[in-house]
Amino acid sequence: MKTVRILWLLASVVCLLQIVSTPAGAKEKEKDPSEKTVDSGSFGVFSGEHRVATETFTIAQGPGGSVVTSEFKSAQGEQVAEQSSRLELTPSVELRVYTWKEALPEKTQATVTPNETFLIERFTVGDKLNEQNFLLPTSTTILDDYFFIQREVLAWKYLHMACHDEKAGLGCPRGQKLQFGTLNPHQRSSMNVSIEFGGKEKVTIHGKEQELSRFNLSGETGDWAFWLDEQYKLVRMRADAGVEVLRD
């Protein structure tokens, strides 16, 4: 049954995510009965032993595609930050629209939409609306600052492309490396990243030892290691700089 469930999950990755979800604290909208929550929860962001931020997320899927929503909150003394994002994907896992909003410390927002061979980002600086074009296909993966759940979506794409079905679940060749084109709307920059399967590892999280699948994510801005559990959900990320992200 586990294999069947995983194959359904990865089929959703090809048809990936139509996620319709509501950020934490927002008024819940009426949902289409055919929509299904694929993943939901929260991540703690740690610098050393100190928790510095929390991301709350939902991934939902329906016949029209997927929606990934996320809310990021950070409070360090008087410095408070609050942002939210919404990523909508078509059934073929192509970008329909991406929006992020900052409520604190300043109010700003940006939207990315496809336009033929371009992706167009519209963003505000002060009261001025700006526009920037990127010569990128709609298959480009959004990897924005602060929203770690988007790395799970990228991981599912990797699983679909690099791994195959086995009796015990999915088989991923160790050392198999794939490249993906990405866009970071916060930085208004694009880059290629690579993911490589690092094998199975025993990792202790919240005092409990688990056997997890390790992957290495590399890009121009730095390297991350991340771990997926047996349900192929992101449970841990660690940056070279020492930042760690843990599922609550």
Task: Identify the function of each model-found stretch.
Residues F46-L129, Y232-R238:
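N-terminal mature ectodomain segment of secretory-pathway/periplasmic proteins
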Residues E35-V45:
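A short, Trp-centered hydrophobic/proline-enriched beta-strand micro-motif
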Residues S218, W224-A241:
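Short, exposed beta-strand-loop hairpins at the edges of beta-sheets
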Residues V38-D39, E82-Q83, E196-F197, E220-G222:
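Short, small/polar residue-rich loop motifs at catalytic or cofactor-binding pockets
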Residues K36-V38, V52, P105-E211, R238:
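Solvent-exposed helix/loop surface patches that form functional interfaces
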Residues P23-E28:
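Boundary at the C-terminal end of the N-terminal hydrophobic targeting segment
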